[in-house]
Every structure is written in structure tokens, then in C-alpha cells.
């Protein structure tokens, strides 16, 4: 009986050790310690949302990311302690800012709830079908460019390219668009007439080019561009799941626009400013 008790005690102790190891202390600081569970509770929801992947354990993060998360968590704790020691929250200015922040948060919550309750499955399906219909038969192109300040610089680059110069190397060395220059001038795939994508002058010239053709210099508000088309292919038709974020954003914008217009109408809003024409003529 005594032997069985010893065995049972040993198993219990081992189980306790194993359980304790599941929530390891990953950092200590003056006044406390940080466990894996605290980090996961603090960051897991937003990290899953940002990455689109399910993060289950602290060990799923690379070591460098683990250290960053620990530092962010501890820094927040330390700043919270500093706030508690100060009188900053009792000032009139802070209270006004706090009230403004609460109002903004309440408005965001109101609008989010309104959107959620006013977008139906039928609205989503109709908008998706419209969205897909606009994509059918369309072409997308993969473009690269070299951006410079003057027409002379652009002409010089065009001359170098016509003599066998390497577009990728010239983009890396000379382009003012550093984001694409680091990738040999490659911007990526674009569609024609997509709002907020690229300026019209650039698009018009790019879509007139053949694959591997290089444009003459093109002027935009950004400077002078030499454009090259790397690839052309049909626009892929996204599934409902793939298009969900885009469709949700389109519908949300439409619903909110109508909601705000209705509020203004109910409030009988009248703008009392003078008309633009009368101001210009005075």
C-alpha cells in the first residue's frame, strides 16, 4: 500500500510539473513576471486577424517575434504603472480627450452595428454577381517602370534600353520610386480603369503596350516614366469567399452613405455658406 502511494505521488508530481511547464515564465521585471498565457491572451485575437492564420501556441512564433511581443507587453505594463503614478488622467484636457475618444468609439460601434444589420445575403449575392460581371473578359497586365524627374533623364534611359540596357538594373539604380525599384521596377498586376490604382496617363500607355515592349517617356504628376509590360493574362474570377472583403467594403460604403444622407434629411440640414460662384465673382 505504501509503495502504491509513493507511485501515485510521483505520478501526481510529474503531472504537476508537466502542467506548469505549459505556461512558462518568458520574462521577469521589477514587480512581476510574464507568462506565455498572458502574451497569448493579449495578442492572439489581433494576430490571428492580421495573419489570417490560426495561432495556437506561443511557440508558433519565431524567436524574434516572441521577444518583440514580450517587450510590447511589458512596456505597456510599465507605462500603465507610470500613468497610475501621475495625475495626468485628472486634468481637464485629458478628460475632454477621453470624452472625445469615447464618442468616436461609440459612433464606430453604432455604424458597425448598423452595417451588420442592414446588409443582407441577397445584397451580398447581387453585389458579388455585379462585381464578377465587371471582371469577366477583362485583362490584367503586370507592369514595371522607371521614374525620373526630367524628360531628358527619361530619354537617356530609353536610349540605353534600346541599345540593350537591362531594365531591371536601370530601375534599381535610377528609379525614384524606391518601393518598386528594389524589385527591379515591378509594380505588379493592374486592371484598366480601377479607381485608386494608377494615374490615367500611366494606365493608358501601359495597356497600349505589348508584352516585353518598353514605352516612350510618359509624363504624370509624379515625374517621367518609362513603362514595361511583363505579362498579360485574363483577370481571374474570385470566389465569394475570396471577394468577401471587397464586397463587404463596397456594401458598407453604400449603406453608410444612405444612412448619413437620411440623418441629414431628418435633421433638415441647410448649409448657409455663400455659393461657390458668388464667391468667385466677388
From Swiss-Prot:
Q: Which residues form the PpiC domain?
A: 138-231
Query: Any stretches that span the bilayer, and where are they?
Result: none
Catalytic activity of the protein:
[protein]-peptidylproline (omega=180) = [protein]-peptidylproline (omega=0)
Gene Ontology cellular-component annotations: cell outer membrane
Tell me the keywords, alphabetical order: Cell outer membrane, Isomerase, Membrane, Rotamase, Signal
The record's comment on protein family reads: Belongs to the PpiC/parvulin rotamase family.
Give the protein's recorded name: Parvulin-like PPIase
Q: State the organism named in the record.
A: Rickettsia conorii (strain ATCC VR-613 / Malish 7)
Amino acid at each position: 500500500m505504501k509503495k502504491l502511494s509513493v507511485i501515485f505521488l510521483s505520478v501526481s508530481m510529474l503531472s504537476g510539473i508537466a502542467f506548469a511547464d505549459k505556461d512558462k515564465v518568458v520574462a521577469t521585471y521589477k514587480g512581476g513576471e510574464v507568462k506565455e498565457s498572458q502574451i497569448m491572451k493579449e495578442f492572439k485575437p489581433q494576430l490571428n486577424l492580421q495573419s489570417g492564420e490560426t495561432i495556437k501556441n506561443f511557440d508558433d512564433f519565431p524567436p524574434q517575434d516572441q521577444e518583440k511581443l514580450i517587450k510590447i507587453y511589458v512596456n505597456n505594463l510599465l507605462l500603465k504603472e507610470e500613468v497610475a503614478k501621475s495625475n495626468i488622467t485628472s486634468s481637464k484636457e485629458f478628460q475632454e480627450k477621453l470624452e472625445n475618444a469615447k464618442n468616436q468609439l461609440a459612433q464606430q460601434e453604432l455604424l458597425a452595428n448598423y452595417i451588420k444589420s442592414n446588409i443582407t445575403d441577397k445584397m451580398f449575392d447581387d453585389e458579388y454577381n455585379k462585381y464578377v460581371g465587371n471582371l469577366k473578359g477583362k485583362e490584367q497586365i503586370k507592369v514595371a517602370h522607371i521614374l525620373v524627374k526630367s524628360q531628358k533623364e527619361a530619354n537617356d534611359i530609353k536610349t540605353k534600353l534600346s541599345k540593350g540596357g537591362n531594365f531591371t538594373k536601370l530601375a534599381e539604380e535610377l528609379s525614384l520610386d524606391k518601393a518598386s525599384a528594389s524589385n527591379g521596377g515591378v509594380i505588379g498586376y493592374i486592371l484598366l480603369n480601377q479607381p485608386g490604382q494608377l494615374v490615367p496617363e500611366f494606365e493608358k500607355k501601359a495597356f497600349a503596350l505589348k508584352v516585353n515592349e518598353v514605352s516612350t517617356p510618359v509624363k504624370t504628376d509624379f515625374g517621367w516614366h518609362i513603362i514595361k509590360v511583363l505579362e498579360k493574362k485574363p483577370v481571374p474570377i474570385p470566389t465569394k469567399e475570396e471577394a468577401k472583403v471587397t464586397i463587404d467594403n463596397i456594401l458598407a460604403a453604400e449603406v453608410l452613405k444612405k444612412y448619413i444622407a437620411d440623418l441629414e434629411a431628418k435633421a433638415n440640414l441647410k448649409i448657409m455658406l455663400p455659393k461657390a460662384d458668388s464667391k468667385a465673382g466677388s
